[in-house]
Amino acid sequence: MISDISFLQDFAEFIVSKFGKENLRKELKIILPNSLSCTKLKGLLTDNYNVQNLPIIIPFNAIISKKDSSEDYMSKMEELFTLSKIITEYKKLDFTPEEALKAAGILNKLFADLVNNNVDIKLIETYNNSEYWQNIYKFLEYSFLKWQKNEKQSSNNYKLKLLLEEIARTKNSCKQVILAGIFKPDSFLKKYEEELQIIKYNEIKLAHNNIYYYEPTDIYEEAEQIAHICKQNADKKIAIVINNNKLKRIYCNYLDKYELVFEDLIGNDLKLTNVSSLLIAIINILCNNFDLKLLFLLLKNPLINCTNIQELELLLSGKNRFISSPKYLLQLQFDNEELKIYCYNLVDILFTTKPYNIKDILVLSKEIFEKILPDIWEKEGGAELSEFLNNLTEFSGSINVSKKDFPKIFALLLSNVKYYKNIESKIIIGSPEELALSRFDLVILPHFNSDNWSNTTTTHPYLSKEAKQILNIDYDEITPKLYSNYFDLLLQNEEVIILNAKKYAGKLSTPCNLFLKLSNKNVIPNKSVIPQLDCGISGVIFLDSTTSTQDDIEQAAHSTFFPNILSVTDIETLIRNPYGFYAKKILKLRTQDKIWEEPKISDFGNFIHKVLEEYSKNYDQQNMLDQQQALLNIGNNILHSTILPTYTKKTWQTKLTLLSKAFILFDMERRKNCQKIYFEIKGELNLNIAGQNIKIIGIADRIEISKSNCITILDYKTGTIPTKKEIELGLSPQLIIESLMILENGFNISHSYAPLCHSCESGNPIENITIAYVKITSTEPYVQTTEISLSMETLEKHKQGLIRLLEYYVKNKSFVYDLDMSKYNDYLHLRG
């Protein structure tokens, strides 16, 4: 049997029967926890009891929220800046501007409680003599005493003044004050109760109607279930009760996904809107040196992203991604006139004017904001952001931070601002304190676990538990009781569904005590009674991995052709990662370096290769010190003509200096036994595979021909060198294939006036080829050489293996997804 118990209904019946509906306005003033409860109670009295003259029914906060233009008091923003300044002036604790602003919010609340409770902060000095706490309390005392010396009254003192005036009016009236409902601990409310004879009505009748419980796999399945439940119960008044803003956003995303209209009492974070992200990005640009990463954090905003921006991003990827000044943007080789004009306008808007103080930054950011997107203030959150920006500009003189620190301060201030979309709907999302007194057809309690609902005690950053008790602001024992009351009130509704995702943020959920208490009464079934999702939904998001067939596992990409020209690195990719080969050579996909991507190890490797190539090709026998300086000069010239961050250039110069001497000694020693050396030389190997002519191309870093006609192929490595086993197995085939090129005269080089190839006719049959990996690093040992001798028999085996490999792919043109032995895979995300 479903109970009709309702707190507000019971309360309405109580006041009508006790005072009479004709006397309510004359005799009563009713204080409720929030405005929603006030609206619901007014509706009950009007509709159910035909009360014509309603009593005063207001939320408690309305008493201390009246604004009087004649009163001069600090705004919340002004208070934060004033307190933040006091905190940073206390040098013993050395707060950063960001830390000071965070601390200011905490101290503002603490100092308000002290004033409202009429407690002397010096009381806490006497009980704990530890050096740590004494230092903290000296800081609190210093800040509090300096805070009280402000000429302008604080907003708390103004609220206290309003409260005392209301208390005086109430004492002089003949009206009874009733506090109805569950109120959170508050120093203003405490003072209000102490000063007046108040009737408290908080009787909660226990009722257990239709209560269901379900444990979704994760938070996203939980959000999907909520959307499904709301869709299935479209004719009902539904409350989704949540006090976690991050989870609320996930639930709202799924409600939006299924086009379900809802009212949100919790509100949205202004900082998370696109308009706020755009403004923060502009301020970051104005407060920092030119940085492409910061520029594209602005340009990639969904409100302004366009084809021109996408083309500019492609143009700037690769070597252009390190440009260090807006003037270089204007020197790019543009593909079309439209992009060129767009880029010139962008530079003019963002980089022409230089702001010198915080007010200049705020004023200029607003101007840029409106130039980039003229209708910006009409976007979601635009009106609230405009008001915030105007208020901040007004108090900008109080902001005592550097330009570098200001973007963090701005973002921190913005994170405390909410905006609301007032939409009437049968679905309402709110916190327990907002919804507990109201009546609904269906209540959903999501993520009902100890982390989210028990509201365990939190540690105050500046006060121990004993200190909170001395200052009379210890609410740790009250809070759990509050949530128990909220829970009991919510259970009065006709139908309640409790959800608790098994896993969230990598942790397993644990049931809260409230749920365990309810389970012990055998109210909740032990199995899920929520209907499973429709096929249309579950087919999208719930997949059973155990049902995959062997065919699914062995899926492969297929092609109608096989390339005629391959590089030696393509062969390695084909061996280690067939699908990566398919993506690169068949689909012609290439990775683009992200604009904000830092220089990589491979970039440093390319730099070293260029330096060593130029040094080796222009080698001049002179003393070692001159050679070392020549090598360093080559490096400096290359860096000067290369677009790189300044710090990267300095780092690479340092590394080159460290390894230069060791490389020159290595080079000189090897030259002693050489009759000829080739540097950065191109080679090829031509094969006919199953009727298809295939050319394999490569570039050898260095080929040495010794005085005894022995051949060594060297490969410079600044990264990891392959293991001997990887080479023997053919997993790292670069130097092996280059050896085969030598045997086929693929490098078109000769020695002793004869082609360098393996044939009897040449008169110079080669017995073996040595391959060498030269590891070059900026730490000792700077140069290490690993050599492996390859006999003709071994090379022939590798050649036959290469032919078999190519025959398979030329004939089948099938590239499996699941084989991946590559160290770096740029195409992994494409496999799904």
From Swiss-Prot:
UniProt cross-references to InterPro entries, sorted A to Z: P-loop_NTPase, PDDEXK-like_dom_sf, PDDEXK_AddAB-type
Organism (species): Rickettsia bellii (strain RML369-C)
Descriptive protein name: Uncharacterized protein RBE_0584
Lineage: superkingdom: Bacteria
